Amino acid sequence: MAAVSFDEKVLAAKKIICDIEGTTSSISFVKDVLFPYALKHVEEYLKNHWSEDATKTVVAALREQADEDKKAEVEGVVTIPAGDSEDIIPDVVKNVEWQMSQDRKTGALKTLQGLVWAKGYKDGTIKGHVYEDVKKALEQWNESGRKVYIYSSGSVDAQKLLFEHSEQGDLIKYVAGYYDTKIGAKQEKNSYEAILKNIEATGEEALFLTDVVAEAKAAKDAGLNVVVLDRPGNAELSEEDRKEFTVISSFTDLPIESVKSTETENGAEKETVTESTEKVADESEKETETETAAAETENGAEAENGASKRKIDETAQDDEAQRPSKVVKVDQNGDSPAVDGAKQNGDSAEEPATLSETNGKSTGEDAMDVDAEMTDVESSSTTKAAEAGTGKVTEKTETEESPKEKETEMEAEAEVSKTDEKEDTKQQGESVTDGEDKKGDVINKNAEDDIKVEEEKNKEEESAPPTKKAKIEEDKMDVDEEDSAVIEKKADNVDEKPVESTTDEVAKKEENLVETPVDTAKPEVTTSEIAVTDETKEAPSDAAKEESVTSTSKTEEEKSDDLVPTTTSEQTVEKSSAEKTESKSEEETDSGTSEKKVEDKSANNEEEQKEPKESVVAEKKEEEIKVKTADEETKSMETDEVTVEKSNTKEVKDDNEQIPDSKADQDFNAKEAAKETVSEELEVKADAIVPADESKPKAQNDETKEKVTKAEEVTKTAETKTEEEEAKKTEEDAKKTEEDAKKTEKEVKKTDEEMPTEEIKMKDEPTVPEKSKSVDEPMATEESVATKEETLAEETSATTEAQATKEDEKPVDTKTNENDKTTPEVKATEEKTDDAKSTEVATATEEDKEMKEANSAEESVETKEKKTEETHTTDEDKPKESDVAKPDVVEKQEEKMETSEQVDETKGVEATTAGPVEEVAVEATEEDVAMEAESSDAVKEETKTEEPKSKVDKLDSEAMEVDSASTSQNEAKNESVKPAETAAVEESKTESDVVSTTSTDEVKENGTSEKVNTKEESRVPENGEADSKVTTNGNHDEKADSDKENDTSASNIEEASSATTTTTNGTSTESDSSSTTPSSETVAEIKSKKATDAVADSATPSVETES
């Protein structure tokens, strides 16, 4: 490769700005390693770090960028919805993938990439690629005094990670600052101008290294020197680009040595070096001045700082090229290597810029101002302290009038070597003067402090004699003036030597209170301090406090007589030194005699001080003992009272526990015992209260009284509980008796209910007339059925029996007067029915009486009337009501009564002569009898006793055959009826679940013709009309009354046979009904009328079918 010619400005550049991708690192590393890693782990990073502030910030920035792209109508932009939930993570990932596919360089994208890459760098999966020539170049540039900056599209964090975790090690120490796209885009001129301002350099002083021509042009426009890198894998450069810019393939192509020579030969550089040295010299002079002033002061911290600064300045004067004071400051910000190089080349004015260049935003001017302010503040503070310290030192020397300068030098050296010790002792001395520190603070000193104090004393003793001589030769007044001056200094916390001596002496004094040290004399401050500490430690009563105060006042008065030995510890030091000088030299006899007098006085004062202290301590101890004994006595009294109270309360509780368990006879005795215990407790507590009143306030007596009242309340509550329990027991006994009475009443009612049913059965049996053997068998079956139904009769209520009695009474009262036209045969039947009625009425009256005793007849009557009204309106519900309300026994009773009524009704209906009219009359009686049989059949079907019903029907048919045997005409009719009757009975068995039964004949309503044994008979009655009957005279009598009676009687049977059409003698008819629609009851009436035709000629009436 041909040699490259460089412009002098390029070689003279002091600030080098480098790109990363294609310049310091390969493009393939970014595209093949970093980008794929970011795409692969971005989602994982977002999920694991979603709650972190950095993640939230970068996501918000990505959202804003997407919104801007959408407004700019960027093709394919992927927006991110608002919100902080993790549901938007997939949208964020899509946005990142879209931007990376477009090779975008947005700040938000680069920031997120840097966060993702950080994980890879830290765990070692990623190592930053750097060309081999980069590390060498960075080292050489730093050694030559140049500063290196990085400007890349990647984030600052990513840049640092790459150089920190590079393949060639940690290179971050060679970089002075980092800039990313936050300062501006790399292809814009303004970005480079901003960087120049930040690093405080001109365009001619800066060099920009890049691989992108567009970036090079922008930097050139900003006035920077530019060199283009042609690395492997970079974009090819055109001939025009090569002509316009200097092109190199490695950093080693830059002539670093020539850069060094140009710097040394450049006059401008020399001027900057001289300026910097002059500044350093000025600063060093100021620091030496402050150091000397601080050395004379007694402030340990300032003296230490001054000494250190003096050493630093001395080293700076020896070697101007190295300035560690400022190098140290810059090193704290990570820019030490660059700063060192800059200082070696006289670059001190620009070095603070590195403090704020890492973020790419702050300016170097601000950094320099801050550094300058720091130095000014330090110098001002040291000078002020030095002035104050020098003023005090001069004041001290004037009062002491020491002719020697060695004393001050010795003191300064001692102060510098003991700065740490003085800080601790200063704080302790201040606390001692204020009277706040106590014994523990002084005792906790280390053995090292004691050794140092002894060394200080030796030094002070060596320096003290000449001053003492001068003082003793003059006058005692001078000594008093010196003491007063020292006291003032001590108040201002300037002189620390007396403080140290006093603290040491205080510690020794407190450790050995009994012994009397000779060498140390207690000053006035320390004696008052001891009194204060005694007050704080031992102050149990007011009397003790007063005594302690008086003791301190006495000691102060005694000390006021002689100020010389009691003012300061400095005087005590002089005393000890004076004793030594007496043994050494005879020339100081005068001073020795004076010092002996002073010592005698101090010893006397110490003895006088200790005597009142010991007396005070003894008095305090005695008082404390008295107070403690009094407290113990009071506590013992309290405990005795508490134990007595506890024992009494336990006794009361035991009594209360026994009271509920005792019987009624022992309640009175228990109450009296409780009262006695309470009275005894009161007496015991009264005895206990008497001594308590002597040592305790009235509040304790009130508490004992309250406890006694509580005990009384406990006994009262126990008594009330026993009374309440007794009342509860009596109430429970009364309830039990009431329940027993109710049970007996219920049992009596049940027996009463069972008795009438048995009596009814007994009375019903004789009413049935004796018949032939064929009739006895059905009766037996009926009796068996009745016995089975007795169990059901027992469960019936009193209301059903009352209903039965009323229904029995009604037919008796509803007799018509149409009995004038009767035949002798009908009269015979009438007599028999009357007998049956009388027996039935008798039974009814007896039942009525029994039911009145049960007080339920009225309620049953009311319920019956309501039911009858309902049945007239709704015929369809009649079968259901009859099923629920009627028991079998009562229904049998009603059937018997109805047969008797129907026979009576036939008296005014039957014809007295033979013929067709006679047949009609007989049919009427037959229909009544058939109706009775039908009602019994219907009731039996409801109770699911179909077998007895069929037998009753057969019984009726046999009776009809016997009655019709006398006439041949009726025999023919009966023979024709039997097959139809048997067919009807069979049909009724098959349709037992249904309430109504139908015969083989068809029933036609509204008077239409109907078939009876294949014969037609004309019918006239309409709904609501009365049946007309033809008498012997040919007149027509209306049977409206009788029909109505039949209707009412049928409804009183709980409508058991409502909507039923039964057959008798093979005929099926319709009868009038009181309801609006034709019912089965009217049909049954007409059938019974026709049945009387077949029975008219027979000698026996139809009463035989009552059963």
Swiss-Prot record:
General function of this protein: Bifunctional enzyme that catalyzes the enolization of 2,3-diketo-5-methylthiopentyl-1-phosphate (DK-MTP-1-P) into the intermediate 2-hydroxy-3-keto-5-methylthiopentenyl-1-phosphate (HK-MTPenyl-1-P), which is then dephosphorylated to form the acireductone 1,2-dihydroxy-3-keto-5-methylthiopentene (DHK-MTPene).
GO molecular function: acireductone synthase activity; magnesium ion binding
Entry coiled-coil feature ranges: none
UniProt subcellular location: Cytoplasm; Nucleus
Basic and acidic residues biased stretches: 260-289, 393-427, 435-462, 486-512, 534-548, 572-586, 593-604, 610-686, 693-776, 804-838, 849-908, 937-957, 1001-1028, 1035-1047
Obligatory cofactor(s): Mg(2+)
The organism of origin for this protein: Aedes aegypti (Yellowfever mosquito)
Tree of life domain: Eukaryota
Name assigned to this protein: Enolase-phosphatase E1
